[in-house]
Amino acid sequence: MRTRIFGRTWLSAVPMLIVLALILSACSGGKSATSSSGTGGMDHGNAGSSPSSSAPFDQQFIDMMVPHHMGAVAMAQIALTRAEHPELKTLANGIIASQNSEIGRMKQWRAAWYGSDQTPPMDQMRMLPGMDMNMMNGGMMSSDIKNMQTASPFDRAFLQAMIPHHQSAIAGAKLEQEQGMHPELKQLAGTIIADQQKEIDQMQQWLKAWYP
């Protein structure tokens, strides 16, 4: 419909308010969609326009890996009470211990190198330069954590989620080894690759054995 406000066609007060409301709603909706993921997934689509995209690569790596680790820890904590197989609970305890330790180290480095230890929340985690959506498909979101609380059989759902989650962490860690500047962070990336590949191999074996 075409409406002229300053022409021969005059709008009544009520239609004018409706038009203005629609315009304001569209503007605010577009802004919120680019600035926050809300209840959706990781904010991949605007990585190129994000102010953090011009940050040093090590900072971007920390800002990706910390919330990525938090997702793994959150899911592993659920496994402590829901897992059927005791070996999966043992793995979950290991994930919680190792990744919480790595989160602490990365936050300390971020504060020392970039003035703050604050990293994005899990649902606003962004891709690293050089990563594509396939690499980040395993990124954990709050909705995934919620679904895991009722998944059945839990152990299969856990393995099917944690394997690609580890794979995406390895992809990011390899980029850190290639493009990072701080040797201690590159060394941590090597640890992530080695430890999580070992866990992937174990989880894949369990998946085949328990759910052929």
Regions inferred by a protein language model and the residue ranges of each:
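Bacterial N-terminal signal peptides that target proteins for export
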Residues: 3-16
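C-terminal motif of bacterial Sec signal peptides marking the signal peptidase cleavage site
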Residues: 23-26
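All-alpha RGS (Regulator of G-protein Signaling) helical domain and cognate RGS-like helical scaffolds
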Residues: 29-212
